[in-house]
Swiss-Prot record:
This is Protein OPG059. The lineage of its organism: Viruses, Varidnaviria, Bamfordvirae, Nucleocytoviricota, Pokkesviricetes. Belongs to the orthopoxvirus OPG058 family. Residues 23-49 are intravirion. It comes from Vaccinia virus (strain Western Reserve) (VACV). The keyword Glycoprotein does not apply. It is a single-pass type II membrane protein.
Length: 49
């Protein structure tokens, strides 16, 4: 009984850890895309002058 509970808790913790890592990756990629778009806009503006 106790062993089953320990296994369940460890599996749940692993799933939560993986999900949080995936969310962090998605947010990091989104931030990078926004920065890249901003840099491209700045470069285009500089080319216009």
């Amino acid at each position: 009984m106790v062993i089953g509970l320990v296994i369940f808790v460890s599996v749940a913790a692993a799933i939560v850890g993986v999900l949080s890592n995936v969310l962090d990756m998605l947010m990091y990629v989104e931030e990078n895309n926004e920065e890249d778009a901003r840099i491209k806009e700045e470069q285009e503006l500089l080319l216009l002058y």
